[in-house]
Amino acid sequence: MRNDNGRKRRSRCIWIILLSLLLLGGCAGVPTKARTYPGFVAVVPGDGETLSGLAKKYLNDPSKGWVIGDFNGIDTVKPGDRVIVPLQPPPPGGVTTRGYQTVPVLCYHNFSLTESGKMIVKRSDFEAQMKFLKDKGYHVISLNQLIDFIQYKAPVPSKSVVITIDDGWRSTYDIAFPILKAYGYPATLFICTDMINNPKKITLNWDEVRELKKGGMDIQFHTATHCNLAKSVDGETASAYFNRLRQELTCSRSYEQFGLKKEIRYLAYPYGDTGPLVIAFLEKMGFDGAFTVKRGSNPFFVDPYRINRSTIYGDYDLKKFEKNLATFSSKAMR
């Protein structure tokens, strides 16, 4: 009964605000007008107003424009629009009466100016995919935001997506990074430490890795040698296998020697493969999350050490690309 009464009070409050918005509507074309109610502000934006501007004014955080947009079902505001600004943040987890929110994590590997292959995405295709995200109203969020969502600490925009790149190919620096910067998208690069400065392959060097980090790219790890952590090799004893796991993961955490002054928090499994022993090692070593290449989006209740990622192959057109962007599930939680 208490919950029903609370919903009724909230409903009455919103109806009062909507009526207020109708009365304020005549103020369009002049500076923003607003009226404050418990938990909400009724706003009719003036000339030049934006969602981020409203968020800065009423929520004290311009990055929370998405909260206003999600609440009102809009991507932008125009003078004369009738907008409700919720003063309380949405609950974490994205659970509604219709289902629950999911966050897709995209996985790229290598890029090329003119050619594509299974693991190589052509520059024009990558740029078209980033433009598609913008045009369709997706919000590209950081890995830290994703983990806060998974840990039920903070909400994320309703159409959130994460971008990751594996290995450490030079094309990340030459091709992907400029495009990501142009769109203002955060992204994470999972590097194999032994792959950097490799004279036999076209890979990044440590100066370029540092420059990527300085430019805003999150640098995380993909082990030292890209070996399969979940399988022992032929003739390998249990003791040797344990030592190899420890060496692969400890080497990956030796950030200081590369001039990258912070500890890593996340691992991308080579080949997406993991198991209980590998996860136990990660937990004991303080990793906060780890990523597979199992295709699918992630609800807040996903195992943080088995986070799904969808590999974007070089032959994907925009229809195939879009199939990897599910941001809501109507399945019942049981």
What spans do the regions from the language model cover?
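N-terminal secretory signal peptides that target proteins for export/translocation
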Residues: 1-11
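C-terminal motif of bacterial Sec signal peptides marking the signal peptidase cleavage site
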Residues: 24-26
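Extracellular LysM carbohydrate-binding repeats and other cell-envelope/extracellular binding modules
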Residues: 30-35, 53, 60-98, 307
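Solvent-exposed, polar/charged alpha-helical surfaces in well-ordered, non-transmembrane soluble domains
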Residues: 52-57, 66, 70, 124-135, ...
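Metal-dependent polysaccharide deacetylase catalytic core of the NodB/CE4 family, i.e.
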Residues: 101-116, 157-161, 169-275, 301-307
